[in-house]
Amino acid sequence: MLYQAASEAAQKRWTTSDFDIGKPLGRGKFGHVYLAREKRSDHIVALKVLFKAQLQQSQVEHQLRREVEIQSHLRHPNILRLYGYFYDQKRVYLILEYAVRGELYKELQKCKYFSERRAATYVASLARALIYCHGKHVIHRDIKPENLLIGAQGELKIADFGWSVHTFNRRRTMCGTLDYLPPEMVESVEHDASVDIWSLGILCYEFLYGVPPFEAREHSETYKRIVQVDLKFPPKPIVSSSAKDLISQMLVKESTQRLALHKLLEHPWIVQNADPSGLYRG
């Protein structure tokens, strides 16, 4: 079983008694996240508590194993750290970095949309994090506002690696979120790391307009708009032509023609708007 295999690989056997557990930070489909303090070091962490029964019922144990395997080996300022994990009879516990300023999704809802400076800073940070991931043969496959957190300095953190995959080849499985799916996944053809470029393009659009570009009332209509790349830029809010140019170069049906991430960092809109520190201070 994954929990035993995982724990034997861990150098330290943690238990709940190693932590002072504080307020809940959020809840998900399979459990809750709590603010916690590791007693010996006084280190503040986020403790993600998942219920085994629910994981087994939904047949997502393999997904959790993958998330743990991948995230525990990644070290990047824009990727949430997974420090370790442990389990008891009923639960699995993930010891995660605490992102003080919480979920980006809530921030976007509150603001409705972001300034170009803020959007560019976030997009550049994520491009750097994805370049790092792709260099380690990790495709994220589920970049969206709900999977991003904001750290104490205003830096963005990729938080959820549940759909990510360690790969050297092209894959065909359907995953990720409907509005963010690229044409090749909608059509169930092979895909590679360029799916993350598409998702980053969708995210950039949503940062600037407050909604994803191919949103429609019916799923079938969303699928159709994605496959046709039915990309429209509404008149409001006002967005620069340079930002639209970048988005248009990322949201290209032919995956090999999408703007490469290192080229994205050289795009005039990024160069002119993104804070080089990667921190958005407001």
UniProtKB/Swiss-Prot annotation:
The subcellular localization recorded is: Nucleus membrane; Cytoplasm, Cytoskeleton, Spindle; Cytoplasm, Cytoskeleton, Spindle pole
**List-wise, which residues carry Phosphothreonine?**
T173
**GO CC terms in record:** cytoplasm; nuclear membrane; nucleus; spindle pole
Give its E.C. classification number. 2.7.11.1
Q: Which domain of life is it from?
A: Eukaryota
What protein does this entry describe?
Serine/threonine-protein kinase Aurora-2
* Residues involved in ATP binding: L25, G26, R27, G28, K29, F30, G31, H32, V33, K48
Q: Which gene encodes it?
A: AUR2
Root EC class: transferase
Q: In which tissues is it expressed?
A: Abundant in roots, flowers and flower buds, low or absent in expanded leaves, stems and siliques.
Q: Where is the Protein kinase domain?
A: 19-270
Q: Give the InterPro entries listed for this entry.
A: Aur-like, Kinase-like_dom_sf, Prot_kinase_dom, Protein_kinase_ATP_BS, Ser/Thr_kinase_AS
Q: Which family does it belong to?
A: Belongs to the protein kinase superfamily. Ser/Thr protein kinase family. Aurora subfamily.
